[in-house]
């Protein structure tokens, strides 16, 4: 029986038999074992300092920060994501095992924030790179708001159906060098598909704007150039 879906369950009744399904048992076991990968790029990430402290103590939710994406099933993105950092974020997400979840924390992560107004190098929303499960607005969000987002994610976990999760594998977005994003199935290798990478056209196919100029120069003979210079000398002497 799921403790989040049925919070009024009396656990003190002796000699009781609780019947459940394998799906609910799997969801219940994952509720208190979320291992986050903290991906912070700017000021919103400083709120984790107070969140880890004794006042809020997010360890009581079973959150154990991991430094390796292969050991994490939750990634919290905080701060501005630039085009230069986008491939690293996608690669970290690809290396996380299924099932995996994303919490977008802060206005800069969700929409690009004030840096995306006239910036050509800022990603306007991390959901253009990876699928987001919970959006957490704020500049920056308070630690209480982060705990509320984790609670909402736990409620989402408790309602998941294993058949749906296994039947429809979560599709991932692949970043290419020409800033185009494709929906691809997960490869878990961290390497880019060479078929999606931008291939520069051959030099012979590039139209040259200076080609008529060189054709004109090649058609002018050295004798004509000598005659032109002689005319210029005569005109200067006459003056």
UniProtKB/Swiss-Prot annotation:
Subcellular location: Plastid, Chloroplast thylakoid membrane
Signal peptide interval: none
UniProt binding sites for [4Fe-4S] cluster: 43-44, 108, 139
Pfam family, any one: Oxidored_q6
Entry keyword annotation includes Transport: yes
GO CC annotation terms, alphabetical: chloroplast thylakoid membrane; respiratory chain complex I
Entry EC number(s): 7.1.1.-
Basic and acidic residues composition bias: residue spans: 225-239
GO biological process: aerobic respiration; electron transport coupled proton transport; photosynthesis, light reaction
Keywords assigned: 4Fe-4S, Chloroplast, Iron, Iron-sulfur, Membrane, Metal-binding, NAD, NADP, Plastid, Plastoquinone, Quinone, Thylakoid, Translocase, Transport
Residue numbers spanned by region Disordered: 217-239
Cofactor comment: Binds 1 [4Fe-4S] cluster.
The keyword Transcription belongs to this UniProt entry's keyword annotation: no
Protein family (similarity comment): Belongs to the complex I 20 kDa subunit family.
UniProt subunit comment: NDH is composed of at least 16 different subunits, 5 of which are encoded in the nucleus.
Classification via PANTHER family: NADH DEHYDROGENASE, NADH DEHYDROGENASE [UBIQUINONE] IRON-SULFUR PROTEIN 7, MITOCHONDRIAL
Role of this protein: NDH shuttles electrons from NAD(P)H:plastoquinone, via FMN and iron-sulfur (Fe-S) centers, to quinones in the photosynthetic chain and possibly in a chloroplast respiratory chain. The immediate electron acceptor for the enzyme in this species is believed to be plastoquinone. Couples the redox reaction to proton translocation, and thus conserves the redox energy in a proton gradient.
Protein name as catalogued: NAD(P)H-quinone oxidoreductase subunit K, chloroplastic
Organism, scientific name: Acorus calamus var. americanus
């Amino acid at each position: 029986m799921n403790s989040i879906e049925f919070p009024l369950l009396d656990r003190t009744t002796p000699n009781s038999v609780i019947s459940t399904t394998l799906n609910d048992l799997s969801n219940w076991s994952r509720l208190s074992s979320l291992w986050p990968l903290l991906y912070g790029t700017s000021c919103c990430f400083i709120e984790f300092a107070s969140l880890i402290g004794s006042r809020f103590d997010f360890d009581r939710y079973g959150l154990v920060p991991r430094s390796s994406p292969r050991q994490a099933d939750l990634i919290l993105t905080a701060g501005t994501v630039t085009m230069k950092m986008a491939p690293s974020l996608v690669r970290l997400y690809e290396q996380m095992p299924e099932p995996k979840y994303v919490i977008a924390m802060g206005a800069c992560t969700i929409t690009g924030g004030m840096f995306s107004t006239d910036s050509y190098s800022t990603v306007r929303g991390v959901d253009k790179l990876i699928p987001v499960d919970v959006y957490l607005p704020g500049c920056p969000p308070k630690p209480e708001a982060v705990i509320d987002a984790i609670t909402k994610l736990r409620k989402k976990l408790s309602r998941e159906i294993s058949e749906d999760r296994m039947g429809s594998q979560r599709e991932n977005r692949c970043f290419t060098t020409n800033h185009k994003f494709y929906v691809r199935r997960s490869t878990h290798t961290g390497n880019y598909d060479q078929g999606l990478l931008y291939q520069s056209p051959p030099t012979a196919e590039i139209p040259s704007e200076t080609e008529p100029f060189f054709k004109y120069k090649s058609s002018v003979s050295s004798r004509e150039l000598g005659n032109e210079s002689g005319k210029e000398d005569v005109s200067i002497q006459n003056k």
